[in-house]
A protein has these predicted regions:
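Residue-level recognition of specific faces of alpha-helices
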Residues: 31-34, 45-48, 59
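Short, basic-rich loop-to-helix N-cap that marks the start of a DNA-contacting helix
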Residues: 39-51
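A short, Lys/Arg-rich alpha-helix, primarily the initiator
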Residues: 1-20
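Short, charged recognition helix plus adjacent turn
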Residues: 9-10, 34-35, 61-68
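Short alpha-helical DNA-recognition segment
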Residues: 15-33
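Short amphipathic helical patch at the helix-1/turn junction of helix-turn-helix
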Residues: 12, 37-40
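Alpha-helical residues within the helix-turn-helix
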Residues: 12, 23, 51
Length: 68
């Protein structure tokens, strides 16, 4: 399973909000909803997040193996 928990931690550390993502990254509210629900987003969205937050993928996404 893909988790965006690191994204929210990175945003908090940087003082960024979802509004920041919408304005600076041109990320739609529906995409933010998908991120909050740990649903799939495009690689273009991941790239935009990295640019807006000046971070790497490891700072916004993590892979959690499915349980047995």
């Amino acid at each position: 399973m893909i988790s965006y928990a690191p994204l929210w931690a990175t945003m908090e550390k940087m003082g960024a909000t979802t509004y920041t993502l919408q304005v600076k990254g041109e990320i739609s509210s529906s995409t933010i909803r998908r991120l909050k629900a740990n649903e799939s987003v495009s690689t273009n969205t991941l790239e935009a997040l990295c640019k807006v937050l000046n971070c790497t993928l490891n700072d916004i996404i993590e892979y959690l193996p499915d349980g047995p």
